[in-house]
Amino acid sequence: MTKKVTKIVAQKRAGRYNIYLDEQYAFPISESVMIKFRVFKGMEVDEQLQAAMIAADDVSKAYTRALDYLSHQLRTEKEVHDKLRDEEIDESVIDATMQQLRDMRLLNDQQYADAFVRTAKRTSDKGPRVIRQNLRQKGVGEQLIDDALAGQFSAEEQIDNASELARKLAKRYHRQAFKTMQQKVRQGMMTKGFDNDTITAAIASLALEPDEDEQWEALVAQGTKLWQRNRKYAFRERMMRTKRSLFQKGFMMDDINRFIDEQVADE
């Protein structure tokens, strides 16, 4: 059944219009859809054309929402898709909207990944593995991630960033036994996403050496707590438990024996 456009009324919202067919309100459309279908007063509209205009308007509205979402920062295809889905937009409309965004070059996961890696290496202490995990969560494909990391985060830059992180971690744990400090530095760097080769190179670049005075102070501080905690045991058991705990914490046995000797002398 064919009807005729008898009235086109602008809505209060800019760029939106109400279409009347045979003097009856029929449907709303955007200005872009009206231009696309060349809608004019007196135009004949059958059911198929009306359905096509309504479908195009659904895409137009979804496209506008996507543009608003993209206006704040770069987004991946998955982020935009999920945003539209969360707004309960039909999947077919989302697919058409996503293609329109691609055609307009408003979605590009490679550019997103490149920018993400550049920002992460400059403003954070994240290594490649954590950056990869972040990009995966945002829906970026493995090959795109590989290309971004290879092009934006060189091996030299990774060692530089890892060295700075190692320096911070060494400072944080400097009151621990030197061996324990080294283990925690390495563990912390692994948690941040650096690989073993990079970690080894970074630690080597710092040329970390134990400070004898600091190590002794740390041993005394921890040893005193252990010595007091173990006072309920017989002397030999107390001594062995304290020694074992200090050794497990990474202190040198010669220093441990010296500490124990001093405790025995004081009692």
Curated annotation (Swiss-Prot):
NCBIfam families: PRK14135.1
One family name in Pfam for this protein: RecX_HTH2
Domain of life, per lineage: Bacteria
Keyword Cytoplasm: yes
Record protein name field: Regulatory protein RecX
Lineage: Bacteria, Bacillati, Bacillota, Bacilli, Lactobacillales
Role noted for this protein: Modulates RecA activity.
Subcellular location(s) of the protein: Cytoplasm
Family the UniProt entry places it in: Belongs to the RecX family.
Gene Ontology biological process: regulation of DNA repair
Coiled coil, from the record: none
Species, as recorded: Lactiplantibacillus plantarum (strain ATCC BAA-793 / NCIMB 8826 / WCFS1) (Lactobacillus plantarum)
Keywords: Cytoplasm
GO cellular component: cytoplasm
